[in-house]
Swiss-Prot record:
One Gene Ontology biological process: methylation
Subcellular locations according to the entry: Cytoplasm
Binding site for dUMP: 141-142, 181-184, 192, 222-224
Organism: Bacillus spizizenii (strain ATCC 23059 / NRRL B-14472 / W23)
UniProt pathway annotation: Pyrimidine metabolism; dTTP biosynthesis
Sequence positions that bind (6R)-5,10-methylene-5,6,7,8-tetrahydrofolate: 184, 278
Catalytic residues as annotated in Swiss-Prot or TrEMBL: 161 (nucleophile)
InterPro entries, per the entry: Thymidate_synth/dCMP_Mease, Thymidate_synth/dCMP_Mease_dom, Thymidate_synth/dCMP_Mease_sf, Thymidylate_synthase, Thymidylate_synthase_AS
Domain of life: Bacteria
Protein's name in the database: Thymidylate synthase 1
Keyword set, alphabetical order: Cytoplasm, Methyltransferase, Nucleotide biosynthesis, Transferase
Catalytically driven reaction(s): dUMP + (6R)-5,10-methylene-5,6,7,8-tetrahydrofolate = 7,8-dihydrofolate + dTMP
């Protein structure tokens, strides 16, 4: 059993037993297959904590870990909102939100790529500012990135689910706290928890810090009603030991990472489970 499997199952059980239904409301989300309302059971304010002795990835089902890393590179490294760039990587998880111009509007990578921070007399984006400050001002309590821009929320195809990171350097270790306003526990959460831990490992490597703690906070923590049956199956499955994530130690610049610099060894997992997408 991994740390992630244990915490994940605990949250799913809480939602199943105590979750509040939104069926009395007219909800925004619709099922991609038939356009009917996609209702949920939800609880609020959940936290997952990991000591980074193992990589947080589910073993009760197969997680498309390379796809998760490719999405991470698209947002954080390319700082892109162009879905066609993601499609070139063989990833189509954002196709349902692609607008006529081929983008997701002013969301995710668009916000990270805006040059809105002052650094030594020039404007830089949030990622470059973060990397510089972690190296040169480690004791700062302002190591924050923010995707939730109220001025541009109406220009986004989908407002960000994971919207904030805060980084801490303590005794030579890099700690990361992530905040998600909303998390679909069947599809979104397994991707997000894994990929932001990969981000922590990447940035720790290029800034020269050891890995510290990883904290993942969720505001609205929910399960879609059509996902309940398969989640019950998943929770009864055998759990395995955590795999080993290898990141190419030769990479010293954040922008030099490619998908080939990541390998996952000994990933034992249950069979893939299909969960319908709500949009």
């Amino acid at each position: 059993m991994t740390q992630f499997d244990k915490q994940y199952n605990s949250i799913i059980k809480d939602i199943m037993n105590n979750g509040i239904s939104d069926e009395e409301f007219n909800v925004r989300t619709k099922w991609d297959s038939d356009g009917t309302p996609a209702h949920t059971l939800s609880v609020i304010s959940k936290q997952m904590r990991f000591d980074n002795s193992e990589v947080p990835i589910l073993t009760t089902k197969k997680v498309a870990w390379k796809t998760a890393i490719k999405e991470l590179l698209w947002i954080w490294q390319l700082k892109s909102n162009d879905v066609t760039e993601l499609n070139k990587m063989g990833v189509h998880i954002w196709d349902q939100w692609k607008q006529e111009d081929g983008t997701i509007g002013h969301a995710y990578g668009f916000q990270l790529g805006k040059k809105n921070r002052n650094l030594n007399g020039e404007k830089v984006d949030q990622v470059d500012y973060l990397l510089h400050q972690l190296k040169n001002n480690p004791s700062s309590r302002r190591h924050i990135t923010m995707l939730w821009n109220p001025d541009e929320l109406d220009s986004m195809a989908l407002t960000p689910c994971v919207y904030e990171t805060q980084w801490y350097v303590k005794q030579g270790k890099l700690h990361l706290e992530v905040r998600a306003r909303s998390n679909d526990m069947a599809l979104g959460n397994p991707f997000n928890v894994f990929q932001y831990n990969v981000l922590q490992r990447m940035i720790a490597q290029v800034t020269g810090y050891e890995l510290g703690e990883y904290i993942f906070n969720i505001g609205d923590c929910h399960v879609y009603t059509r996902h309940i049956d398969n989640l019950k199956i998943q929770m009864e499955r055998e759990q395995f030991e955590a795999p080993e994530l290898w990141i190419n130690p030769e990479v010293k610049d954040f922008y030099d990472f490619t998908i080939d610099d990541f390998k996952l060894f000994n990933y034992k997992h249950g069979d893939k489970l299909l969960f319908e997408v709500a949009v």
